[in-house]
């Protein structure tokens, strides 16, 4: 399951753990630790968190403990730093220092600007702060997490060594241009939402906007996942899409994570099935933007 993370020098697992769930109050400290340890035992070495994920950074840092050196930690920020205005150079600098404390580490492997719009992404002070942090050894890779126009710009920006974006059966927008562009520059690419919010769970259009959008696309595409189950089709399509380094699954259930690991362990989809998925999207979704 191990692959290279672009030209960054990092090695990552094809399957990553999205740690947003372990930051929620409903999840106990013990459950968070068991999930992280189960991920490690499954061979997962890529862990993705963010400043906005509740207590996730603190819990991940505690759970990793002495095994920190065997994993790649990806976090996200640009906001919420003590005593700083959001999306300023000072916020980036202070935010990285605070993340290091929460994660109990002396460096973050990948630090993303978290979904800021294009006009914010252009601010030179943000790039200067990232470069200083990298030169100081506090981060190894400066990155951007987001979609659409901002992603396209970031994929061409010299500051960034990786990007994170939405990629799944129902959201292939980034595969048209931004991901190939990033891959051509040997950037790492993290795919978020590889299950596309799993709209196949519903017999009727769901009420939540993000799931409803995926459900609408699923219906429009009229794609039959056979001979596979939807979950396996979705995970293998995303994890092995050209240019993708790691597909991040967000869950708090060990059995779901283990099932995802088994699916990705099956390797890439057959080429004819991949072509069918791409064709079903392009036939109706040529104008669909990335789902934010």
Regions found by a protein language model. Give the residues of each.
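Active-site mouth loops of central-metabolism enzymes
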Residues: 18-30, 77-93, 224-225
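Short, acidic/polar
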Residues: 26-39, 87-103, 146-154, 230-235
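Alpha-helix-loop-beta-strand connector modules within alpha/beta enzyme cores
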Residues: 58-77, 128-137
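Acidic-and-aromatic substrate-binding clefts and catalytic sites of carbohydrate-active enzymes
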Residues: 24-28, 50-58, 80-85, 118-122, ...
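Beta/alpha (TIM)-barrel catalytic core signal, keyed to glycine-rich beta->alpha loops juxtaposed to Asp/Glu
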Residues: 115-292
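Active-site groove signature of glycoside hydrolases
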Residues: 100-119
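N-terminal binding-site loop/beta-alpha segment at the start of enzyme catalytic domains
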Residues: 1-71
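Conserved, mostly hydrophobic/aromatic
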Residues: 5, 17, 47, 60, ...
């Amino acid at each position: 399951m191990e692959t290279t993370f672009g030209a960054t020098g990092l090695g990552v697992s094809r399957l990553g753990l999205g740690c947003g769930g372990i930051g929620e109050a409903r999840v106990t400290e013990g459950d968070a630790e068991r999930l992280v340890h189960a991920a490690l035992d499954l061979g997962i070495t890529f862990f993705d968190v963010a400043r906005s994920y509740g207590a996730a950074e603190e819990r991940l840092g505690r759970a990793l403990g002495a095994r920190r050196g065997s994993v790649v930690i990806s976090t996200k920020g640009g906001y919420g730093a003590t005593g700083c205005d959001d999306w300023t150079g000072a916020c980036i600098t202070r935010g990285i220092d605070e993340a290091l404390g929460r994660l109990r580490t002396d460096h973050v492997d990948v630090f993303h600007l978290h979904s800021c719009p294009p006009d914010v992404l252009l601010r030179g002070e943000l790039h200067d702060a990232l470069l200083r942090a990298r030169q100081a050894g506090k981060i190894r890779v400066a990155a951007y997490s987001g979609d659409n126009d901002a992603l396209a710009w970031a994929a061409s920006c010299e500051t960034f060594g990786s990007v994170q974006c939405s990629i799944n059966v129902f959201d292939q927008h980034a595969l048209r241009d931004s991901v190939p562009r990033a891959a051509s520059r040997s950037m790492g690419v993290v795919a978020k939402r590889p299950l596309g919010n799993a709209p196949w769970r519903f017999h009727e259009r769901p009420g939540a906007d993000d799931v409803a959008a995926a459900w609408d696309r699923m219906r429009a595409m009229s794609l039959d996942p056979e001979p596979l189950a939807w979950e396996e089709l979705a995970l293998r399509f995303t994890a092995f899409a050209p240019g993708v380094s790691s597909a991040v699954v967000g869950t708090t259930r060990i059995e779901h994570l283990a099932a995802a690991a088994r699916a990705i362990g099956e390797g890439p989809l057959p080429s004819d099935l991949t072509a069918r998925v791409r064709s079903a999207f392009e036939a109706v979704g040529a104008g669909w933007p990335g789902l934010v």
